[in-house]
Each structure stands twice: as C-alpha cells, then as structure tokens.
C-alpha cells in the first residue's frame, strides 16, 4: 500500500474544555492563529511542532487554528476531531 500525505485544518475553541488526542504518526503541526499546548510545549502563531509519537493538543486561552500534515499508510483512515468545541477539515490528500 502506498503512503498518503494528508493536510488538515484543526480549529479548537475555548468554549469547551477540549483536547485533541492524536495517535502515533509522523506529523507536523503549524499554528496559524492563537496558541496551543502540543505535547506539553506551548506553540504560538507562526510556530510549528513536529514529532511521531502520540500527542495531545490543547487550545491556548484564545483558542487555536492549526494546519496538520500527517504521513500514514494509504489504507489508514483520517484523523479528525469529533468533540464539542473542535472541528477538522481535511484539505488535501496525496497518495505518494
């Protein structure tokens, strides 16, 4: 199976106590607006985080909008937010 590169836009608000748990995958998260605690590190607008382990994303006091790139097996499903106060849009899927 060919690998797939996916780009998501995640928006987490502060209206709810939310956290987004992501499974272990090679990924890169760029914070577009606001800030977030990603893997215990505060990442602000214009900054990025990268890693391959399981990670938790929590919005900062003003919420967060981020772009998330993930490299996965082609037969793996999408990793999307599914709780109040969170929304994910899959922007791009490219089979490599």
Regions found by a protein language model. Give the residues of each.
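Jelly-roll (double-stranded beta-helix
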Residues: 1-96
